[in-house]
Curated annotation (Swiss-Prot):
Role, per record: Ribosome biogenesis factor that coordinates hyperactive transcription and ribogenesis. Part of the small subunit (SSU) processome, first precursor of the small eukaryotic ribosomal subunit. During the assembly of the SSU processome in the nucleolus, many ribosome biogenesis factors, an RNA chaperone and ribosomal proteins associate with the nascent pre-rRNA and work in concert to generate RNA folding, modifications, rearrangements and cleavage as well as targeted degradation of pre-ribosomal RNA by the RNA exosome. Involved in nucleolar processing of pre-18S ribosomal RNA.
GO CC annotations, alphabetized: chromatin; fibrillar center; nucleolus; nucleoplasm; small-subunit processome
Self-association state and partner proteins as the record states: Part of the small subunit (SSU) processome, composed of more than 70 proteins and the RNA chaperone small nucleolar RNA (snoRNA) U3. May be a component of the proposed t-UTP subcomplex of the ribosomal small subunit (SSU) processome containing at least UTP4, WDR43, HEATR1, UTP15, WDR75. Binds to RNA; binding is required for its chromatin association. Interacts with CDK9, DDX21 and SUPT6H. Interacts with RNA polymerase II. Interacts directly with UTP4 and UTP15.
Protein name per its UniProtKB record: WD repeat-containing protein 43
Family of this protein: Belongs to the UTP5 family.
Tissue-specific expression: Detected at low levels at least in heart, liver, lung, spleen, thymus and hippocampus.
Length: 677
């Protein structure tokens, strides 16, 4: 996170909270803690100057902040002198501080008046504000958000002047060029915009993770470059979970778009400050605060491409003094660092965010490693033990009637013992009879097996809350493996709202595990979504929080039809296999037949076997007879043909004889006639 701007942060980390030094004089140091409060400290005497708590500091926590530039402050101060009601005549009247929130609104806070100056909401962002940049010449400021848009605001009218889409994903960082005509924006890729036309001038490769800081390192381009005010300038970029800070140069469109050089540090950079180079011979001084609490100092002349990453010239650490041999020095995290006006000293902010220590340290160019011993035992630093001791258990009278269960996360109310009469004192009276041990044991009612202790109605809710806050696997298993639906509903109804999202995340993680546990988690998920639907609908980042769960449910629903078909087929196959196995094992009951057919005896069968041999001979004889019959038939046919021929000849003879008779001729002799007869 660069000074004067805001970036993404992790509230649980020792560093990474939105903070910034006031411009030019660095008289104030502003930081927004994770509890939503804004604190302004005086750097000269390390005294708390102001403290401001926004009305919606719990739901809309501060995500980034930026001081108004000194030039704009002087202009605002001159305008305010005209008012009689605010005749202060000081330049600090317009020390405005812009605060970006998690719900998309921007607050303008006046450190002089100690109250809210104005609020920018209408027509702006719909999601978390990641970075704010003031324009150095006019009354505009620019903001970017997770909703992918960049918004140009007017601080006088508190309205949107222009709004355009900056990237396909969330835009995490902004930076205005020294001449005020260009704007750098970054998500994962870096874009250079022309503010007048809102068009992209150049594209840069960027980082693999979201960019958290952008800073121009030079004011004027080199003399060899075209004098368009932007070509040839260098700027610096740092990203989340990236130990390299890349340096880019604005070149012509046809040239390479990768980084010209890079600086390497020991951990992720959380705060970056630098001194601008006014000419090509002046080196750039860079101070990088890492998440591990160290400060790395670099000094390099930007002149073209450099292949190897550059290491720091000096490293600064702070530790507690080791008093004696038994006491080990402990490191003190450095939270922020900024160069002073002389560029030879450094303002360090270290300790904790509730009571930071601000110190000015002189730089020595000869030392490569500086370790400062500081005692911060006098500074108030809340610990876990002090937080636990502040939780007090309410004491209730035995006659009081409790209408609602106790607050989840606290112990059950402790009832006062019944008031004892004054006679039951420890003092013994002379002459009084003392009860025996047997009588005392009988009065103590040691038989507790028949009795049942009064169960706390909120015990499961308390266990679930403690398990989610401490991430205790055993406690979560004990609670989430409950199969009683009524108990699940009562538990979900009593949990506090702050653990609803962690509970949904835990259920989503368990839904991806074993199928047996997933069936139980569905009951919990159904109760949570049903009971706390109104609360979930008010969350601004609900889509990101429940995106994994939604995709998981969609994938399960898409495969449900196929799984049901497969389930039906498998049931059919298994049923048939089991039925066939059962039928084999079962014995059929004995039944009497209505009709019995008895075949011939075996003796008759043996007699019948002998003719079977003769049947072959008979078969041959039959074949011979058939062949003879066929021959006889052929002979008969031949005889019939001969008879027919004889008949035809006789008819012809008769015709001849009849003709002769008609003619009177007769060739027949008596002898021949007798022969014929």
């Amino acid at each position: 996170m660069a000074a004067g701007g805001g970036g993404s942060y992790d509230p649980l980390a020792p560093a990474g909270v939105p903070c910034a030094f006031s411009p030019d004089s660095q008289a104030y140091f502003a930081l927004a803690s994770s509890d939503g409060q804004l604190r302004v400290w005086e750097t000269a005497n390390n005294r708390l100057h102001q403290e401001y708590v926004p009305s919606a500091h719990l739901s809309g926590t501060c995500t980034c902040l930026a001081w108004a530039p000194a030039r704009l402050q002087a202009k605002e101060s001159h305008q305010r002198k005209k008012r009689k009601s605010e005749v202060t005549g000081t330049k600090d009247q317009a020390d405005l501080l812009a605060l970006g929130t998690a719900v998309g609104s921007i607050l303008l806070y006046s450190t002089v008046r100690g109250e809210l100056h104005s609020k920018l909401t209408s027509g702006g962002h719909e999601n978390r504000v990641n970075c704010i940049q003031w324009h150095q010449d006019n009354d505009c400021l620019y903001s970017c958000s997770d909703d992918k848009y960049i918004v140009e605001w007017s601080t006088q009218t508190c309205k949107v002047k222009c709004k355009w889409k900056g990237d396909n994903s969330s835009v995490s960082s902004l930076c205005i060029s020294p001449d005020g005509k260009m704007l750098l924006s970054a998500g994962r890729t870096i874009k250079l915009w022309v503010l007048e036309t809102k068009e992209v001038y150049r594209h840069f490769t960027g980082h693999a993770t979201p960019v958290s800081s952008l800073r121009f390192t030079t004011i004027r381009p080199n003399e060899s470059q075209p004098s368009d005010g932007i070509t040839g300038l260098y700027f610096l970029s740092g990203a989340v979970h990236d130990r390299l800070l890349n340096v880019w140069q604005v070149r012509s469109e046809n040239k390479e778009k990768s980084a010209v050089m890079s600086f390497t540090v020991t951990d992720e950079p959380v705060y970056v400050d630098l001194t601008l180079s006014e000419n090509k011979e002046e080196p750039v001084k860079l101070a990088v605060v890492c998440r591990d609490g160290q400060v790395h100092l670099f000094e390099h002349i930007l002149n073209g491409h450099c292949k190897k990453p550059l290491t720091s010239n000096c490293t600064i650490q702070i530790a507690t003094p080791g008093k004696g041999k038994k006491v080990t020095p402990k490191p003190i995290p450095i939270l922020a660092a900024s160069f002073c006006l002389d560029k030879m000293s450094l303002l360090l902010v270290y300790g904790n965010w509730f009571q930071p220590t601000i110190e000015r340290v002189a730089l020595n160019s000869k030392d490569t490693h500086i370790c400062l011993e500081r005692d911060i035992s006098n500074c108030w630093a809340p610990t876990v033990e002090t937080a636990i001791t502040k939780v007090k258990t309410p004491v209730m009278n035995s006659e009081a009637k409790v209408l609602v269960p106790g607050i989840p996360g606290h112990h059950a109310p402790i009832k006062l013992p019944p008031a004892q009469p004054k006679e039951a004192e420890n003092k013994r009276k002379l002459g009084s009879t003392e009860a025996t041990i047997e009588e005392r044991l009988g009065a103590m009612d040691l038989d507790r097996k028949g009795r049942k202790d009064d169960l706390q109605t909120n015990s499961f809710a308390v266990l679930l809350t403690q398990g989610l806050e401490s991430n205790d696997f055993e406690i979560l298993n004990k609670v989430l493996q409950t199969k009683n639906v009524n108990l699940i509903k009562r538990t979900v109804l009593r949990i506090p709202l702050r653990v609803v999202i962690p509970l949904l995340q835990e259920l989503t993680k368990r839904l991806q595990g074993h199928p047996n546990s997933a069936a139980l988690m569905i009951q919990w998920l159904k109760c949570v979504l049903t009971i706390h639907a109104s609360y979930l609908s008010t969350l601004p980042d609900l889509v990101e929080q429940l995106g994994t769960l939604y995709q998981l449910m969609e994938s399960r629903v898409k495969t449900f039809q196929k799984l049901s078909n497969l389930h039906g087929k498998l049931i059919l196959l298994v049923t048939q296999v089991t039925a066939s196995e059962k039928s084999k094992k079962m014995t059929s009951p004995g039944q009497k037949a209505k009709l019995v057919y008895e075949e011939e005896s075996s003796e008759e069968e043996s007699d019948d076997e002998v003719p079977e041999k003769d049947s072959d001979d008979n078969w041959d004889e039959d074949e011979d007879k058939d062949s003879e019959k066929d021959e006889g038939v052929d002979e008969d046919n031949e005889e019939e043909d001969e008879d027919m021929e004889d008949k035809e000849e006789n008819e012809e003879d008769r015709e001849v004889s009849s003709e002769k008779e008609l003619n009177g001729d007769s060739d027949l002799d008596p002898e021949n006639e007798s022969e014929e007869e």
